[in-house]
């Protein structure tokens, strides 16, 4: 499954009462697809999945599939720390017509490597969809060891990719070196996109692509075409906004950044809160320099 170079971890728009706003979602999807997005992740971390109900997630999957209409792959965030619930949601996502699912490592209950292997194996066995693993130990505590990722890629045909947000380039290099060529490793950290490309990564599952998708595409294309100095210049240009988007809990900064760009996507749900005025001014200043 080709997810492209830049997959956007899409925010979930809300109205002024905090309900999912599908009209805003339609506008957002069109905007992203015109600005460098090769595929969309729906109801992931940036989509505020912890505060979305199961019914809301299914509605988001269905609506996004309909709105995208085959233009790019749609990847549904169906992972959780409850294997049975993840299987149920994955089946609903498949019924909705998504192209793949993303499964985060189980959080809070701190499973062993064998527990994580069996968790992912059980979910993958219940779907024909391609599976992208998601390793983000900064959020989940549990980190998927490279050996476990390699084992999953070898043993389970529909485990086809991983979003790696561990920040461990040595581990990421090992995964790339010891998995099949058609197993794709994506950076889960915008700021590490270029370093991960340099060790053989495929691209990025991005937050910054909401704001700088075209530039990120150009950076990756320059790198793959051997124009590494030009790629480095774009990386240096984008690094301040990549950092600014994570100075406050994600996705409050990126939602504010979209609003500053004239795209109303609403606020965040509690326990997240909007940016302070100082945070907003800092973000606005950084965006204006892009």
From Swiss-Prot:
The keyword Cytoplasm applies. Gene3D superfamilies: Aldolase class I. GO terms for cellular component: cytosol. One of its GO terms (molecular function) is 4-hydroxy-tetrahydrodipicolinate synthase activity. Keywords: Amino-acid biosynthesis, Cytoplasm, Diaminopimelate biosynthesis, Lyase, Lysine biosynthesis, Schiff base. Its EC number is 4.3.3.7. CDD domains: DHDPS. InterPro entries: Aldolase_TIM, DapA, DapA-like, Schiff_base-form_aldolases_AS, Schiff_base-form_aldolases_CS. It is an enzyme of class 4 (lyase). Homotetramer; dimer of dimers. PANTHER family: 4-HYDROXY-2-OXOGLUTARATE ALDOLASE, MITOCHONDRIAL (PTHR12128:SF66), DIHYDRODIPICOLINATE SYNTHASE (PTHR12128). Belongs to the DapA family. This is 4-hydroxy-tetrahydrodipicolinate synthase. It comes from Bacillus subtilis (strain 168). The lineage of its organism: Bacteria, Bacillati, Bacillota, Bacilli, Bacillales.
